[in-house]
């Protein structure tokens, strides 16, 4: 069985060497979809009986690990010295230094890397993170797959 939940956040970024407007500082209303697979929990006394995982727990983990960290932040590539220097001069600015250029593809892969260890097989139901889908716009997204 697979389950999917969706969370949204706002963040800024830039693609430093991009040939078009994406090289400029700009932002998006991102959506993050998390797909997990596992057996339906059969333990009758468990609050999660009949579920793969409680959606509220799926969302809480994603919020704490990724969404709250990235929401209303500027995601900047660690080697984008010009923008990093600028952001470091802004008092109390929420900056996330990214290991790679923060494209939709790299953001999806980074979210997958972060979340993979967060979703534990607590009930022995073979819980597994299958996919992280990151929407940069309503019509454009990237999938990071198991």
Predicted region positions:
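Charge-rich, low-complexity N-terminal segments
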Residues: 1-146
């Amino acid at each position: 069985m697979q389950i999917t939940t969706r969370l949204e956040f706002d963040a800024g970024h830039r693609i430093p060497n991009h040939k078009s407007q994406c090289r400029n500082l700009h932002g998006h209303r991102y959506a993050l979809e998390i797909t997990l697979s596992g057996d339906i929990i059969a333990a009758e006394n468990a609050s999660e009986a009949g579920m793969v995982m409680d959606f509220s727990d799926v969302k809480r983990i994603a919020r704490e690990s990724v969404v709250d960290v990235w929401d209303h932040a500027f995601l900047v590539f660690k080697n984008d010295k010009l923008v990093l220097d600028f952001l470091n001069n802004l008092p109390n600015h929420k900056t996330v230094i990214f290991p790679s250029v923060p494209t939709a593809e790299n953001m999806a892969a980074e979210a997958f890397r972060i979340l993979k260890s967060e979703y534990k097989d607590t009930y022995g139901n073979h819980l597994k993170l299958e996919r992280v889908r990151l929407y940069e716009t309503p019509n454009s997204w990237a999938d990071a797959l198991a």
